[in-house]
Amino acid sequence: MGKLGYIIRCIAHMDYSALFDTVKQVHKLSGKPRAAILADIVSCGFKYGAGYKDYLLCEFYNLNSEQRATFVTRGINNSLVKLLNDSSYYHILDNKTEFYTMFGEYLHRKWLNFAKCSKSEFIDFMQEFDEIICKPDDLCCGEGVDKLKKADFNTLDDMYDELKKRQISIVEEVVKQHPDMNRINPESVNTIRVYTILSEGRANTVYACIRMGNSDRPVDNINAGGMYSPIDMETGRIAFPACDKQRNVYEKHPRSGCVIKGYQIPYWEELMQMCREAALKLPQLGYIGWDVAIAEDGPLFIEANNMPGHDAFPQMPLQAPDKIGFLPTLRQYVKGI
């Protein structure tokens, strides 16, 4: 059923309360009649594969049809995933244990398969560390990730039991990020999301953005309260002030005061090369979003995604002042989208 089937699934599972809330927001922003806005959102869903979140975040209400056709929407991103990625290989990235095993040379930190280890193995592992990061296996967007301190438990037996209750699969050494990355926001490991596309046997780094935490949680994901900003692919400098999912703009990080635009990401060339090299190890997935941390001695992988989100592309008004979306860039590497 292709595109029609996708639209039918979206209609069946849509959050209609959020849809009508979006209509209200756009009405306040644009002054346009609510009925006209709702009709336009529905039309954009059929014509461009745009969801109501796309409509609001990218301000489709201020774009003409030619401009709208240049944006990577939810539907187009899903089509790109379907075109380039073999779903029978998704488990390699979805399952953190499999990912850590296959891409172990790029992790640069100690970790333990907690789901299969014994209590004594866990206790031995913890002799080296005062705190750890713990992760469930198949969740995304930073869900279930936590930092635990050994001192917060009476015994390591108690700590082990608590991790079992949480159904944790991976425990790992805490990444000590590069001082330049820590300066942006010391409360989280601030990662670089790098998008790779395989084309004619070559791995291309097509886009990258920095994701910064903005809460007490040790995660930076924009779906968990974080913010992001595109990075200049040539220089490795942050290209714009940061934005979050509520469309707030940050010239400086609210927790550190660090000026965001123009900030240089360390080890930029090494980071790009690592992602291209890793992409070639898994040619069955031609479109991957890699989450990379920068440690004092270089880049390392946190995780990777076989359905990388399109909401981090440089398509919000601040990032696309010419009102041209990211689709023309992707079409340089992919035919048929």
Spans of model-derived segments:
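Conserved N-proximal alpha/beta basic substrate-recognition cap immediately N-terminal to
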Residues: 6, 10-124, 128, 275
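Active-site nucleotide/adenylate-binding loops and adjacent lid/helix of ATP-dependent enzymes
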Residues: 79-192, 200-201
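Acidic carboxylate-rich catalytic motifs and surrounding loops in phosphoryl-/glycosyl-chemistry enzymes
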Residues: 113-117, 210, 288-291
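Generic recognition of flexible, low-complexity loop/linker segments
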Residues: 122, 180-183, 276-279, 288-290
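Extracellular structured ligand-interaction cores
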Residues: 129-131, 189-193, 205, 287-289, ...
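Short, flexible loop/turn elements at secondary-structure junctions
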Residues: 138, 152, 173-175, 196-198, ...
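ATP-dependent carboxylate/phosphate-activation module, predominantly the ATP-grasp catalytic core
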Residues: 185, 189-273
